[in-house]
UniProtKB/Swiss-Prot annotation:
Transmembrane annotation, as ranges: none
Assigned protein family: Belongs to the RimK family.
The protein's name: Probable alpha-L-glutamate ligase
NCBIfam families, alphabetized: rimK_fam
This protein's UniProt keywords: ATP-binding, Ligase, Magnesium, Manganese, Metal-binding, Nucleotide-binding, Protein biosynthesis
Superkingdom of origin organism: Bacteria
A GO MF term: metal ion binding
Source organism per UniProt: Haemophilus ducreyi (strain 35000HP / ATCC 700724)
EC code: 6.3.2.-
Cofactor needs: Mg(2+); Mn(2+)
GO-annotated biological processes: protein modification process; SOS response; translation
Length: 305
């Protein structure tokens, strides 16, 4: 068994844990950066074919190694960040055309990485989300803000680990933030702020048809974001059956095999904040004491059968 992990930062906790899980199962794992790859479409042996090349080293290296044709793989595990989404998904498309097993296909990955598009898909399936809006460049900023109550949440449409998520507590501040984002040509969306859940949310880790673990995350004092990467803390919790079903439904609606589903408790019930295609393992493993990495690899092996 030979697996390819697409990852820019192999030293990260999640990548190292998945690497260890493969080693424990005597699986060969190659960890390669999709940004160092080239996909070639050409007629080879009188037939149109696709080839994938990889080039090690850095752009500034004077004696950089020549690109090499990549070998075949049995399965692909995407773990690339937001900045690598476009190239990473094109590499996933390459392997999909070759019928290689992929954990989280490119269509689902692209959708999950677009916060607004994913919210639209969730809402179309009547999955509860916070009141949200997206406006075109010629729509009045003031009129856009008036669709929400203050304070409100402003999010960039791409971003992870709490980066690009801002809480605005006045109309003046909201206008200033939106004008800045528009000037920088950064797509953004607005959401109602769930006051009653300030600084706290839930991460449900979904693998296949079940929630394998769930944690409650609490943000730092005076920070409404509960992300672990922003300094938040986590404690393991048990979701009831309905809550687990909502998390699994959200992941499946986006099309993901493995997902981190972020939930928030409101006066209207449980809401889905977003669905992550590349959820980190650090917080969930340390809080739950479970071998989530091993469960992911076992699920990938089951997909291969």
């Amino acid at each position: 068994m030979k697996i390819l992990m697409l990852c820019r930062e192999p030293r990260l906790y999640s990548c190292q844990r998945l690497k260890q899980a493969c080693q424990d199962r005597n699986i060969q794992l190659d960890i390669l950066d999709p940004n160092r790859m080239l996909i070639k479409l050409a007629v080879i042996d009188a037939q149109m074919q696709a080839q994938l090349y990889y080039q090690a080293g850095e752009i500034y290296d004077k004696c950089r190694a020549e690109p090499s044709l990549l070998a075949e793989y049995d399965a692909v595990l995407p773990r690339f960040g937001v900045s690598s989404t476009m190239m990473g998904c094109r590499v996933l498309d390459y392997f999909a055309a070759k019928k290689v097993v992929i954990l989280n296909n490119s269509t689902a990955f692209r959708l999950a990485r677009d916060k607004w598009s994913s919210l639209q898909v969730l809402a179309a399936q009547h999955i509860p989300i916070p009141t949200s809006s997206f406006a075109g460049a010629l729509f009045s900023t003031a009129a856009h803000i008036s669709q929400h109550r203050i304070p409100l949440v402003i999010k960039t449409c791409s971003g992870s680990q709490g980066v690009g998520v801002m809480l605005s507590e006045s109309k003046v501040h909201s206008v200033s933030l939106l004008q800045t984002l528009q000037q920088a040509k950064v797509d953004n969306l607005l959401q109602d702020f769930v006051v009653e859940a300030r600084g706290q949310d839930i991460r449900a880790f979904v693998i296949g048809d079940r929630v394998v673990a769930a944690i409650e995350r609490n943000g730092l004092e005076n920070d409404f974001r509960a992300n672990i990467h922003q300094g938040g803390s986590a404690s393991v919790i048990q979701l009831n059956t309905a809550e687990q079903q909502l998390a699994v439904l959200a992941a499946k609606t986006i099309g993901l095999d493995v997902a981190g589903v972020d939930l928030i408790r409101s006066n209207k019930g449980l809401l889905v904040l977003e669905v992550n295609a590349c959820p980190g393992l650090d917080g969930i493993e340390k809080a739950s004491k479970l071998d989530i990495a091993g469960l992911i690899i076992d699920y990938l092996l089951a997909m291969k059968k």
